[in-house]
Amino acid sequence: MFAIIQTGGKQVKVTEGQEIYVEKLDVEAGDTFEFTEVLATSDKIGHPYVEGAKVVAEVIKQGRQRKIIVFKYKRRKNYRRKQGHRQAYTKLVVKSIQG
């Protein structure tokens, strides 16, 4: 059974036991989190969400991705700007899909 959930402005297809990375959620490691914004399951399609459906996941860890470098440059104008960014994420493992 699979489900499509909406979190952090993105849509993610999940199955039971799958590990997923999503945008940072305000929960601690070891807690459980319920996604109620379920767009579809293997047998139902929501309009926009499936009524009574939820996906329960356990938080594995909070972390930050690799650093990416943003470099702005204009030739002949002595304009250079270098900036780094690390995106925060939450790693989850899907425990159950209901509905």
Swiss-Prot record:
One of the record's GO molecular function terms: structural constituent of ribosome
Q: Name one GO biological process term.
A: translation
Q: What SUPFAM superfamilies does this protein's entry cite?
A: L21p-like
Under the heading Pfam families, the entry gives: Ribosomal_L21p
Sorted keywords for this record are: Ribonucleoprotein, Ribosomal protein, RNA-binding, rRNA-binding
| Record's GO cellular component terms | cytoplasm; ribonucleoprotein complex; ribosome
Record note on quaternary structure: Part of the 50S ribosomal subunit. Contacts protein L20.
* Family from the record: Belongs to the bacterial ribosomal protein bL21 family.
What is this protein's function per UniProt? This protein binds to 23S rRNA in the presence of protein L20.
Listed name of the protein: Large ribosomal subunit protein bL21
Gene name of this polypeptide: rplU
